[in-house]
Amino acid sequence: MSSRETFDAFSNGKLTGLEKSFGDITWYLHPKFEGVEMKDIITSEETEGKFSFHLVKIAPEKKIGLHIHENQLETHEVIFGEGLCKTEDNECAYKSGRIAIFPAKTKREITAGAEGIYIFAKFIPALK
């Protein structure tokens, strides 16, 4: 199974216990960053605000610009594609298999490479 097929499997997966089908959840455009789509697969409503999980697609050569989450720790699991992640202190290549952890108040931006990049993002506490 390719990494893109793995991402698609998550996009159409199910949440055990609630039997929630992720395929029924609509992708939406990020309100600030062109070329970025998100799917909220587990939200604060289901976790009492404790955490949330999101699938993120960044189109080729597009980016999630410099931003910060004041209250959430965020993790990224890169499922498909390549790109670059920059923080104030570091710059690292993003590619399939890379995991990044950002404590609250960490500024970062993610730029997708030529094929785009697909990320599984998790927030503690929940983003939304």
Predicted features and spans:
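A short, N-terminal "cap"/entry segment at the start of jelly-roll beta-barrel domains
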Residues: 1-50
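Glycine- and acidic-residue-biased ligand/ion/polar-headgroup-sensing regions
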Residues: 71-74, 78-83
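A generic "binding-loop/recognition-motif" signal
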Residues: 60, 71-72, 90, 106-107, ...
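Short beta-strand His + acidic residue motifs that chelate non-heme Fe in jelly-roll/DSBH
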Residues: 66, 85-86, 102, 108-114
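A short hydrophobic beta-strand segment most commonly corresponding to one strand
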Residues: 75, 101, 115-128
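Short acidic-glycine-tyrosine-enriched beta hairpin
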Residues: 89-104
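Conserved short histidine dyad/triad with adjacent acidic residue
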Residues: 39-40, 52-70
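Short, charged/polar surface micro-motifs in flexible loops or helix N-caps
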Residues: 46-50, 58-62, 82, 125-127
